[in-house]
A protein has these predicted regions:
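Short, flexible turn/loop "capping" segments at secondary-structure junctions
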Residues: 21-23, 146-147
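Central regulatory/effector-binding core of bacterial HTH transcription factors
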Residues: 25-88
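Alpha-helical "hinge/linker" immediately C-terminal to small N-terminal DNA-binding modules
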Residues: 1-19
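N-terminal Rossmann-like NAD(P) cofactor-binding module of classical short-chain dehydrogenase/reductase
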Residues: 3, 77, 175
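Residue-level recognition of oxygen-bearing side chains
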Residues: 5, 35, 162
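C-terminal regulatory
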Residues: 70, 82-194
Length: 194
C-alpha cells in the first residue's frame, strides 16, 4: 500500500508539474504609444492577466518605437508598420481619425458643413519634439487644400492626448483618433463623413 501511495503521489506531482509547464509564466513586456496604451490597452489588459495569472506584465508606453530585436520589449503594438520588418505582425484593430472640436469652440466659431469651411477655423496640430505615433498626424491641415498647402495652426502639441485636452478646452479643431474620444466630455466630431 505504501509503494502505491508513493507512486500515486509522484504521478500527482508529475501531473502538477506538467500542468505548470504548459501554462505560460514569466515576465512579458509590451510596448505601444502613450495614447493607445493609456486609453485602450490598459483597460483591456485585465482579461489577459486573469487568463494567464503566472505572467507578470510590464507595459511601456513610449511614442518612440522600441527595438524588439534587442529585447527592449517582447511585444510591440504599433500604430504603423514597424521599422524592423522581420517581426511576426498581426493587425489588431483599425484606428480611424476624425476632426473634433469642443461645443464651446463650435458655438463661438460655427460648425463646419463642408471641407472648405475648415479654412475659417483654428487648428491644433501635432508638434515637434516627439515622434508621431502615426504616419500623417496632420492630414486635416491639408484636407481639401491645393498645391500641397496647409492650413495655419494656432497651436502645436507633441502628444495626441495633449491634442485632445486642447480641443476640449476650446483652442480649436484637431484630427484625433476615435479611440481617444470615446466617453470623453466636451468633444464633438466635425464633418463625420470625412
Amino acid at each position: 500500500k505504501t509503494a502505491h501511495e508513493v507512486i500515486s503521489k509522484l504521478k500527482e506531482v508529475e501531473t502538477t508539474l506538467g500542468d505548470k509547464k504548459n501554462k505560460p509564466s514569466g515576465k512579458l513586456t509590451v510596448t505601444t504609444v502613450v495614447s493607445l496604451g493609456t486609453t485602450w490597452l490598459t483597460p483591456r489588459i485585465q482579461e489577459f492577466m486573469q487568463l494567464n495569472p503566472e505572467i507578470e506584465v510590464e507595459l511601456i508606453f513610449d511614442d518612440k518605437e522600441l527595438d524588439l530585436s534587442t529585447r527592449q520589449a517582447d511585444i510591440g503594438i504599433f500604430m504603423r508598420r514597424p521599422k524592423q520588418l522581420n517581426y511576426i505582425q498581426k493587425k489588431l484593430i483599425d484606428i480611424n481619425y476624425h476632426i473634433y472640436g469642443s461645443p464651446k469652440y463650435l458655438e463661438k466659431h460655427g460648425y463646419p458643413k463642408t471641407v472648405n469651411d475648415l479654412n475659417k477655423h483654428n487648428f491644433i496640430s501635432f508638434g515637434r519634439g516627439a515622434p508621431s505615433p502615426v504616419y500623417n498626424p496632420d492630414w486635416a491641415l491639408k484636407l481639401g487644400m491645393k498645391d500641397n498647402k496647409k492650413r495655419k495652426t494656432v497651436m502645436r502639441v507633441n502628444s495626441v492626448y495633449g491634442l485632445l485636452l486642447a480641443v476640449q478646452s476650446g483652442v480649436g479643431l484637431a484630427a484625433i483618433p476615435d479611440y481617444l474620444t470615446v466617453k470623453q466630455p466636451n468633444i464633438v466630431k466635425v464633418l463625420p463623413n470625412v
